[in-house]
Amino acid sequence: MSTTNALLYCAVNGIANNTNGIGRQTKTFLATLARHNHRLRAHAGAFTPYLAVPEPTPATWGYNEEDLLYARRVVEALGGKVIILPYDTRRPFWQPDAWRELSVEAARVAGHLAGRHAKVLAIGVDTPFAGLAHHAGAHPAVEVLLALFSTARITERPRPDPDRIAWEEEAIAAANLRPRAWVADIGDFLTRHLQDHYGLDPASLRSWPSGLHLTSSDLTPPTKTEAERIVRALGIPAGRPVVAAVGRTDHTKGLDVLIEELAPMRDDVHLAMVAVPTDDERAALLDHYRHRSAELGLSATIVGRYDRDIPRALAAWPDTIAMAVPSRGETLANIVFETALWAQHAGAVVLAPNIDGFPEQITDGRNGLLYDPAPGALTAGLRRALALTSDERLRLRTAAHRRVVAERNAAEHLATLLATFWQPRTTPVARLHGHPATDARTPRSQAPTSTHHPLEATP
């Protein structure tokens, strides 16, 4: 048996594809492993990284062989491997039956690794791998961390799927009960939400704030020439204020709201929207966005594909007055953090609703703009963004960049997380305001009894 530990990262996106926020989190994780492995080992001890991914097929949403090859290169260079998890690919993927099967397979892999390594930390990323909590304790060398980034009660308002809610509730209940199961504290809003609506015991938390690989080349601002080339190729008119937006074709992303609320400003701004089609019936929303924009007479460019260079260029383009994030529900929006890095020299100020995790990311008037989620409020927020002076815009962008760099270093966060599991007396590398050092956490045996709130759907 090896004396090193094993880190098993289980994710459905970002290994063989990259089509949503979970994909971005996984890419951040891989970049952190590749660039900061020595730092991680110095702080947490020697370990071998493994990736577990559902069996990829050509039908996988956004399947990209290059993504899979990159993931393999990263972990194999560190002695690990990508592990393919079999499941019934004939059944719908976004259903608890498929997730249950994947969680069983991931738990089996963790147990196998425990026979080869001193300790195993299995991280189940988001809802599909929440079922890992049920298997915690099956092997004394395996600990499980559920890294949830949202819930059905947030993303499926106002009518969340009851089967998905039940799956989430069962996972949190298991994490509360099992001594080697934990839940990642990725941010204040989501943690409060899990406590209030799912009965999460605070003693089950381990701090792992959402972060970015800050030195990644795709997070550096483009040159003005590069941004202009991309913007012009999209047909965006010169000299007109631009409102940018990026999201998938999903009701929760609120792109339809942005289109409607831009109508009173049709003569003032140009809409540059990236609407990434999903792999199901929601993809039809792309045509709806285009038709509705035409009906309202908007000046608009709606791009129906994802190329990371496009939002990067839009965020940094000097004519972009706002990166609008009109979500109906959001834990922590990657685009808020990314825009702060892309637009550090010129370009967009982020405009988002004053709901959920956005106030955790944005202090209104200091590093971005917030608006109340009421009819007409987004229009007012856009007018406010349009009226900003160049000095005001510079002040907001500078503060946004400074805050992200100070608070969202993924390498520091991962080093601290691993140390709390494998070097429990180690002083944390860094922590955010509101995220106490996890080695100072009340031991679960001494923690007060959790207060369970009514399991009601969020209005």
Regions found by a protein language model. Give the residues of each.
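Aromatic "clamp/platform" in nucleotide-sugar-dependent glycosyltransferases that forms part
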Residues: 328
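Conserved acidic donor-binding segment of nucleotide-sugar-dependent glycosyltransferases
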Residues: 364-365, 369-376, 384-390
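Nucleotide-activated donor-binding/catalytic signature segment of Leloir-type glycosyltransferases, i.e.
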Residues: 286-318
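Conserved donor-binding/catalytic core segment of Leloir-type glycosyltransferases
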Residues: 8-10, 184, 232, 236-253, ...
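Short, structured helix-loop element that forms part of the nucleotide-activated donor/catalytic region
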Residues: 62-72, 228, 272-299
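Short hydrophobic beta-strand element within catalytic cores of glycosyltransferases
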Residues: 344-352
